[in-house]
Regions:
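Active-site-adjacent structural elements that line small-molecule/cofactor binding pockets in enzymes
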Residues: 1-270
Length: 270
């Protein structure tokens, strides 16, 4: 099982994120992630949130070995054509270390949705947001592989696209969610599924995702299941009940969240 860190960006400054990523690399962690949010969900005016993609691009130059990714990109914030080029470019900058996490964004009832509402950006219904994730993954693959055929979905359309940057290799697409609908989308259109480590239905969601992936006709061995949890000893140490549960489910990657000011001593525990 790979062990990664997620650097929560709320209230952080890039120099401390860079220092934490380098400490994680030195400590033997496998990857670093960050959130994709526009502001602090608690609306603290002084906090601020560094933009995810800019941060990841800078971290690609600041590290050598770590995989890098957003956990996860809100597909309501970027058109998939723009995202395809962003991801292809970061794949070049990082030397092929990108893991592209995609998510549906927040529901209207969640505090995270207020960042979009404050900018007069639409917060779509659940069905629309789920469709957007599925179609974003399809559009990305078409543009990355040079497929010039037209695409007509419910959320996006392509008119014989050509000439877009093609990453080599294309980054894996990791779809995050907390229910069977998103697990199914992850299996059908993604290369991996991500959810909470303590999700009560973790085994069932992993099964749904894997079965959907097998039904898509793609290689089952290439599909991954990852989870996230807070950085603590019970997740860092092998052999704990928490780690044993993940192993029974077949989790491939554990992503541990840490907040600023980042405890570099804690980061070095592994």
């Amino acid at each position: 099982m790979k062990i990664d860190l997620l650097l929560i960006p709320v209230g952080a400054r890039y120099p401390e994120m860079r220092a934490a990523a380098r400490a994680a690399e030195d400590a033997g962690y496998d990857g670093v992630w960050t959130w994709d949010h526009l502001r602090d969900p608690d609306e603290r005016a002084e906090a601020g949130v560094p933009e995810a993609w800019t941060t990841l691009t800078a971290l690609a130059e600041a590290t050598r070995r770590l995989t890098l990714g957003p956990l996860v990109l809100n597909t309501g914030l970027r058109h998939p054509g723009l995202l395809a080029n962003m991801a292809a470019t970061l794949q070049q900058v990082s030397g092929g270390r990108l893991l592209l996490g995609l998510g549906a964004g927040a529901t209207r009832s969640m505090s995270y949705a207020r960042e979009q509402e404050a900018l007069n950006m639409e917060v779509s219904p659940d069905r629309v947001r789920a469709e957007r994730v599925a179609e974003t993954a399809q559009v990305l693959r078409r543009l990355w592989t040079g497929d010039e055929s037209s695409f007509v979905g419910t959320q996006f359309r392509l008119d014989r696209p050509s000439g877009f940057l093609r990453p080599d290799p294309p980054p894996p697409i990791i779809v995050a969610g907390f229910g069977p609908r998103m697990a199914g989308i992850a299996g059908l259109h993604g290369d991996g599924f991500n959810t909470q480590a303590m999700h009560p239905n973790l085994a069932e969601l992993a099964r749904v995702a894997r079965e959907a992936h097998a039904a898509s006709g793609r290689e089952p061995a290439r599909f991954s299941v990852s989870v996230f949890a807070g950085l603590s000893e019970r997740w860092l140490r092998a052999g704990t009940p928490e780690r044993a549960r993940l192993e029974r489910v077949g989790v491939d990657r554990l992503i541990l969240l840490t907040s600023p000011p980042y405890d570099l001593g804690g980061v070095r525990l592994r």
